Structure formats: C-alpha cells, structure tokens
From Swiss-Prot:
TM segment ranges: 57-79, 99-121, 140-160, 188-208, 211-231, 237-257, 262-282, 323-343, 385-404, 416-436, 446-466
InterPro entries referenced in this protein's UniProt entry, alphabetically: Glycosyltransferase_ALG3 (IPR007873)
Function summary: Dol-P-Man:Man(5)GlcNAc(2)-PP-Dol alpha-1,3-mannosyltransferase that operates in the biosynthetic pathway of dolichol-linked oligosaccharides, the glycan precursors employed in protein asparagine (N)-glycosylation. The assembly of dolichol-linked oligosaccharides begins on the cytosolic side of the endoplasmic reticulum membrane and finishes in its lumen. The sequential addition of sugars to dolichol pyrophosphate produces dolichol-linked oligosaccharides containing fourteen sugars, including two GlcNAcs, nine mannoses and three glucoses.
Protein name stated in the entry: Dol-P-Man:Man(5)GlcNAc(2)-PP-Dol alpha-1,3-mannosyltransferase
Pfam families: ALG3
UniProt organism field: Meyerozyma guilliermondii (strain ATCC 6260 / CBS 566 / DSM 6381 / JCM 1539 / NBRC 10279 / NRRL Y-324)
Gene that this sequence comes from: ALG3
Length: 475
C-alpha cells in the first residue's frame, strides 16, 4: 500500500512547485522596437491628459509652473497701475487716524471695501514702504496665485475622478495671471479664502464618518471664520452664501442650532475685523455716525457700475444697462435660477434622502435629523457635491450680476474648469470653450460679440451641468 501511495504524493508536490514557478515567471514584455517605443510615448502623453492616476504627477508640475510663470511675468512685463496707488492713499489716511469712511478716498475714488481689505493692504503698505516697492507686492500676489492654484487642485483631488486636462486649465488663463501679478486687486485674497472654505467643507464631508459630529462641527466653524474673512475683504463672497448655508446645514446633521452657531461665528468675525470702525464700546452721536457710515459704504448694495467697463452686458443698450428696471430684472432672474437649482438639485430627494416637505419640517426640529443616505456626507459623492454646489451657485451669481469688470474673472475662474469637466463634453470641446471664454475676457474693450458669447458660454455650461444627473447623484 505504501509503494502505491508514494508516487502520488510526489507528483502532487511537483505540481505545486511547478505552479509556484509558473506564477513567479517574468511577465511577457512586448518586443523592443521603435514602433512600440513610440506607442508607449503616445500612451504616456494621453495618460497625462486623461488618466486621473496621473494627477499625482500633473499637480506638482502645475504648482511649480505657476510659481515660475509668476516670476517671469513680474520680471518681464510692465506693471499696470489701476487702483493700487488709490488703495495705498486710502490706507495712509486710515493710518493717520481717519475713521470716517465717507472721507477716506484716493485718486480713483472713495473706499468701498470692508475692514478686512484695510488690514490686508495695511500689511502690504508696511511690507512695501508705503506701496513704493511694487515688485515686493507683486511677489506677494505671485505666491498668493500659486497658493490658490494648489488649493484649487486639492479641491479637485477630493472629487477623485477629475481628469488631468481639467487641472491644466486652472493655469491656462493669461487674464487671470495679469489680474494677480500686474493689477494687485483685492479680489484675489477673497478668492483664496473661498477656495479654502470649499476645501475645509469637502474635507469635513470626506472624513464625516471618521471624525464624528463634534470635529465636523468644528471644521464648519473654521470654514465660517474663513468665509467671514472673505466677505470682509470684498462682498462678492456673498454670492456663495446659499451654497455655504446649505452645505453647512447638512454637515451639521441638519441641526438648526448648530447652523445658527456657525452664523454667529461669522457675525463675530465681522465685528472683530471691523472693530476699529464699528466702535463697539462707544454709543455717542459721533460713534453712531462713524459706525453707520462704515456699514453703508463698506456694504453698499446699491453701487452703480460704469457701462464702459462692463464685460458681460455690452450687448445691452447703455440706457437700459443703467436703469433700475434692468437691475431688478437681473435680481429676479438670479433668485429664480437659484431657487430652481436648490429645489431640483441641492434639495433633491435623491441627494438628501428625504422629500422636500420632510426636509422643511425637519428644519424646525432642534436636533440631528439627517438621513443616513444623504449624499452630502457620503465619502465618495460628498466632496464632489460640495464643489458642485459652490461652483454652480457662484456662477449663477456671476452670470446674472449687475456687471462684470475685468478683475472679476478671479471670482469664478478657479472652478470653471471643473464645471467644464462636469458637462461631459470631453477635453476637446471643453478646451475650445475655455479658449473662447478666455478670448471674451482678453477682448478690451468688450464688444457686443464678446459679451454675448460670454453670457452664452456661462449659461450653456450651467444648463449642461444641471442636466447631467450623474454629476449630482453618482453613477
């Protein structure tokens, strides 16, 4: 019996060894030919544009490229004085003790921005010897531009599946580079803050289950602090307000008390930043006058815009552009489109996990009411939804704004590549759209054609993003 079994055991052992040796054999490689090498190069180049796996290579290159490009532009392109000298004149008056916002002015006009703007440009004034050392200020804006590109790439990375070509469009705007290092507008600081707000809230969504409700709530407070600082620099950040409140409400697990706490933090930040002009501890007649003057001038919602600078409404006759009727029409359109997006997308039952009626009823309950299927707190879909919500809300505001001046491109240029990617048009059509969009902003002065095309591109992009359900609900 033993003799008959030994050969069988030996054969099984050999079979196992043969199997292991076959598994450890080197994989078959294609023949080393010129044709195969060329194909590998072509496939590698295509991957650098199309494969999200290559983002780990593309992003560092883009950040370094931005930093170097800023330095080259600063060294070789003449600085253009528009408003920076006026900013410095206004800061000099404030440094000399002037607190009356109605008296603070410069060559191109009175001060129209809140106290966050004042604090940033006071620092820039100190750094540049009263604004005389322009290259130093340009370097600051160059680093700010590089930081904004890095933060923007991070917001895209948390989405997960964004292809590299969309990242490349982030650094493909000549006008945007000019706004940062050749114009020195305060819009750039507001933009950096808003990208930071988006990133913090995306991170809270991504790690929602890991961090727990307390730490997520603390992250929303950090975002509120940053958002309030953005508003204190320039009021265009208010265009993000609907998106911010919606996202924070869901991250706070639909707890209205937590949302109110977040809003309170925003108010407190405004008070602290504007303390010098609000004179909180004084209640005499002069203090009341200075306080009201600051609020009216820094947060003026009735400012008029000059027709000669408009980028988006050149095809509208000037007499209609300057009328109250046109302003009210745009306001109604803005609110209507926003409500449409809120009801049909942001508050969709496919996203919130409950009907709109239930969502509204739960809003009056002072405790956590969020559904377990809510996609805003889903690790896979949440960061994408948050970026979509912020990007579409802001773009709606930009599209239907009273007027766009050339520096206002910085308001939304950082999320435009993501919206183009979300249309599903692909790199060729999206790249062409981006190029035409850039042409609209490079055309100076704007023309009937350039402004009409700009409005068309923004409208068509928003409509397509809304229509693609997989953007919002996942595949």
């Amino acid at each position: 019996m033993e003799e008959t079994h030994e050969p069988k055991k030996h054969s099984e052992k050999e079979e196992i060894e043969d199997g292991l040796s076959s598994k450890t054999e080197a994989p078959h490689l294609p023949e080393f030919t010129f044709k195969n090498v060329c194909n590998d190069i072509i496939n590698g180049v295509i991957a650098l544009f199309m494969d999200p796996f290559c983002n780990a290579i593309v992003v560092p290159i883009l950040v370094v490229f931005t930093s170097i490009a800023c330095k080259i532009v600063i060294a070789n392109v003449k600085y253009t004085e528009i408003d920076f000298k006026t900013y410095m004149q206004q800061i000099d008056m404030i440094n000399d003790g002037e607190l009356d916002y109605s008296l603070i002015a410069g060559d191109t006009g009175p001060i129209v921005y809140p106290a966050g703007f004042v604090q940033i440009y006071q620092w820039l004034s100190w750094l540049s010897s009263g604004g005389e050392d322009i290259p130093v200020v340009q370097s600051v804006f160059g680093y700010l531009h590089t930081l904004t590109v890095l933060l923007t790439c991070c917001t895209y990375s948390l989405v997960g599946d964004v292809q590299p070509w969309a990242y490349m469009l982030i650094v493909a705007s000549k006008r945007l580079m000019s706004i940062y290092v050749l114009r020195l507008f305060n819009d750039c600081f507001t933009t950096a803050c808003m990208v930071g707000v988006t990133l913090v809230l995306q991170a809270a969504s991504y790690w929602f289950d890991t961090l727990g409700s307390t730490l997520v709530f603390l992250l929303t407070l950090v975002a509120a602090d940053l958002y309030s600082m953005a508003i204190s620099i320039k009021m265009n950040a208010l265009l993000f307000m609907p998106a911010f409140l919606i996202v924070v409400y869901f991250l706070c697990m639909e707890n209205i008390l937590k949302l109110l706490a977040v809003i309170l933090v925003m108010v407190l930040v405004q008070v602290m930043v504007g303390w010098k002009f609000l004179l909180v501890l004084f209640h005499d007649e002069d203090a009341n006058y200075l306080r009201m003057t600051y609020l009216q001038r820094a947060f003026d919602f009735k400012r008029s815009f000059l027709y000669e600078w408009t980028v988006n409404w050149r095809f509208v006759p000037e007499e209609y552009f300057t009328s109250k009727l046109f302003a009210n029409f745009l306001l109604v359109c803005h609110i209507s489109v926003l409500i449409f997006f809120v009801i049909s997308r942001f508050f969709s039952s496919k996203i919130t996990g409950k009907s709109l009626v239930t969502l509204v009823k739960d809003g009056f309950k002072p405790f956590n009411t969020i559904a377990s299927t809510n996609l805003y707190v889903n690790k896979k879909q949440g960061p994408k939804l948050i970026l979509l919500t912020f990007a579409t809300t802001n773009t709606i505001g930009v599209l239907l704004s009273r007027s766009l001046h050339y520096q206002f491109l910085s308001w939304y240029c950082w999320h435009m590549p993501f919206l183009l990617y979300s249309t599903g048009w692909g790199p060729i059509i999206s790249g062409a759209m981006w190029a035409v969009h850039e042409w609209c902003w490079l055309t100076f002065p704007s023309t009937i054609q350039s402004s009409a095309i700009l409005v068309t591109i923004l409208s068509f992009t928003l409509a397509t993003v809304w229509h693609r359900g997989e953007n919002w609900y996942g595949s």
